[in-house]
Amino acid sequence: MEKSPRYRDKAKNLLPSPSSCTTTPTRYVKDDMYETTFIRTDPSSFKQVVQLLTGIPKNPTHQPDPRFPPFHSIPPIKAVTNKKQSSSFRLSERRNSMKHYLNINPTHSGPPEILTPTILNFPALDLSPDTPLMSDPFYRPGSFSQSPSDSKPSFDDDQERSIKEKGFYLRPSPSTTPRDTEPRLLSLFPMTPIHSPAPSPHDH
């Protein structure tokens, strides 16, 4: 039935042409209240028909409300009052004027100033007194320099001679020990066994 020439002519008359859209397509309203439109057209004009039905009309019936600006519009910049402008201008003037009077000298041209308690106005703070020099207990007059006329041998000479001859250091010993005796070497381990004393009969 749909392939008969008579049906084709009838359907062709009902289809809207790309140049004019005066023909109203068939619309069906279902129970769910969603409008459905069925349109038949040939493949060559399908693209133009879709653009005519879904595109933006040349004379839109819906005009935007001028009271409500569009969503993507940029809000206008609020004008700044003259008072704020004058205050900011004065602030910039003060900053510019301060630059001319700013003077920084990181290096001192004169000699360095010595800070003392008097200059710092601290009368309670006094400089510590000099520590008196104490006699060096390790200092011996004849150890560093000895005149050739002095024939008395020094302690260092005796020590060096004893090292070469005896092989040990000579240290000053107490006055009770004779100076000429060699130091007695103590053994770390006993040479003879140490026996414990026999138990007495009173221990039982």
Swiss-Prot record:
Domain of life assignment: Eukaryota
UniProt KW keywords: Nucleus, Phosphoprotein
A Pfam family reported for this protein in Swiss-Prot or TrEMBL: VQ
Compositionally biased tracts (Basic and acidic residues): 1-12
Keyword Nucleus carried by entry: yes
Modified residues (Phosphoserine): 17, 73, 128, 147, 173, 196, 200
Main localisation: nucleus
Modified residues (Phosphothreonine): 131, 177, 192
InterPro entries: VQ (IPR008889), VQ_4/11/13/19/31/33 (IPR039611)
Cellular component GO terms, alphabetical: nucleus
Low complexity: compositionally biased ranges: 16-26, 143-152
Residue numbers spanned by region Disordered: 1-26, 56-90, 133-204
PANTHER family given in the database record: VQ MOTIF-CONTAINING PROTEIN 11-LIKE (PTHR33402), VQ MOTIF-CONTAINING PROTEIN 13-RELATED (PTHR33402:SF16)
Record's protein name: VQ motif-containing protein 13
Top-level taxonomy: Eukaryota, Viridiplantae, Streptophyta, Embryophyta, Tracheophyta
Gene: VQ13
